[in-house]
């Protein structure tokens, strides 16, 4: 079992299989020119899998594959099957923008993927183009339906932005509700790679909007879950991920592995240690020691919390998967 110095059990590994993305979302990607890490500097699936085995053997029970956009990395379903074959009952999930999902949903399900979280910030084509900086909505919605048809459980992630999609939150909730998918509204996480002019809605503002049409009751928060859960009168539940709340980090159970091999204890901070040398030489003991060291470095909380002057993270989310 992996336990940090604050007594939090860490059983959740998020793996960024690539930092590349086929979108340029304004709340994620930098405004200035940048270059991707060369492909030859990324861990191979075999190297990633070696660390996955270490993490599972140490007590990890949940793995999520992220990016960038994970589906732009070739043969992702092969990596999914490697993990699933090693630990068939592992909670194996994927976070995606959905654009390529129509091509891969069934293959991923057959390989052992169980769940998907999909970004959907708007149902309006022009707004989608504004956010992603390309025309994407038709492909995203087609991918969503393909995932449901493949038998995957799908949650929708929506970043709530003032003046962009705040007039659509109820429509988005109803879109998810009618398809029996949970939607989670995400507070915009300030970071130095995003557009400076973006302003996010806080959880209270999101609730005020939903409450204009629905009676909303706060539900019991699941252990280790990042989202606060709310219930409508008909029993439908939606979530709000609110990293600005002071208790957001109290039950954090996750660590992150970047595509180039950096093991990251916290999304907000830049601290990380590399496992690349260890896994490239097949050093299981060395990789395990680095995992323990990163766990010891896991901070108590981020600095988005109320009372921390709303500091801005310098972390590039497209490199760590958010």
From Swiss-Prot:
Keyword Protein transport listed: no
Record carries keyword Metal-binding: yes
GO molecular function, one term: 4 iron, 4 sulfur cluster binding
Positions of [4Fe-4S] cluster 1 binding: 21, 25, 28
Entry binding sites for [4Fe-4S] cluster 2: 249, 252, 266
Every Radical SAM core domain range: 5-233
Pathway connected to this protein: Cofactor biosynthesis; molybdopterin biosynthesis
InterPro entries cross-referenced by the UniProt entry: Aldolase_TIM, Elp3/MiaA/NifB-like_rSAM, MoaA, MoaA_NifB_PqqE_Fe-S-bd_CS, MoaA_twitch, MoCo_biosynth_MoaA/MoaC, rSAM
Keywords tagged on the record: 4Fe-4S, GTP-binding, Iron, Iron-sulfur, Lyase, Metal-binding, Molybdenum cofactor biosynthesis, Nucleotide-binding, S-adenosyl-L-methionine
Chain positions recorded as S-adenosyl-L-methionine binding sites: 27, 68, 119, 189
Domain of life from the UniProt record: Bacteria
E.C. code: 4.1.99.22
Main function: Catalyzes the cyclization of GTP to (8S)-3',8-cyclo-7,8-dihydroguanosine 5'-triphosphate.
Record text on subunit structure and interactions: Monomer and homodimer.
Family the UniProt entry places it in: Belongs to the radical SAM superfamily. MoaA family.
Protein name in UniProt: GTP 3',8-cyclase
Organism: Campylobacter curvus (strain 525.92)
Lineage: Bacteria, Pseudomonadati, Campylobacterota, Epsilonproteobacteria, Campylobacterales
């Amino acid at each position: 079992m992996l336990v940090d110095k604050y007594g939090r059990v860490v059983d959740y590994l998020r793996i960024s299989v690539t930092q590349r993305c086929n979108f340029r979302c304004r709340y994620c990607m930098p405004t200035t020119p940048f270059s991707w890490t060369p492909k030859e500097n990324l861990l191979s699936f075999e190297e990633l899998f070696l660390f996955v085995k270490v993490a599972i053997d140490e007590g990890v029970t949940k793995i999520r594959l992220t990016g960038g956009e994970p589906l732009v990395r070739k043969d992702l379903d092969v990596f999914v099957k490697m993990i699933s074959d090693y630990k068939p009952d592992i909670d194996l999930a994927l976070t995606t923008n959905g654009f390529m999902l129509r091509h891969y949903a069934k293959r991923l399900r057959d390989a052992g993927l169980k769940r998907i979280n999909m970004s959907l910030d708007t149902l309006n084509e022009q707004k989608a183009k504004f956010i992603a900086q390309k025309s994407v909505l038709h492909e995203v919605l087609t991918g969503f339906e393909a995932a449901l048809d493949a038998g995957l459980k799908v949650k929708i992630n929506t970043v709530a932005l003032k003046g962009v999609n705040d007039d659509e939150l109820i429509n988005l909730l109803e879109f998810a509700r009618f398809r029996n998918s949970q939607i989670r509204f995400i507070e915009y996480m300030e970071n130095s790679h995003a557009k400076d002019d973006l302003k996010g809605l806080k959880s209270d503002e999101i609730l005020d909007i939903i409450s204009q049409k629905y009676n909303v009751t706060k539900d019991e928060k699941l252990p280790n879950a990042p989202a606060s859960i709310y219930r409508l009168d008909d029993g439908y539940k939606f979530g709000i991920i609110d990293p600005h709340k002071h208790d957001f980090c109290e039950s954090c159970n996750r660590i992150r592995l970047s595509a180039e091999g950096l093991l990251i204890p916290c999304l907000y901070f830049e601290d990380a240690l590399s496992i690349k040398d260890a896994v490239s030489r097949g050093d299981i003991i060395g990789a395990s020691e680095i995992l323990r060291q990163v766990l010891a470095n896991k901070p108590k909380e981020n600095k988005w919390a109320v009372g921390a002057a709303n500091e801005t993270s310098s972390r590039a989310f497209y490199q760590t998967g958010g």
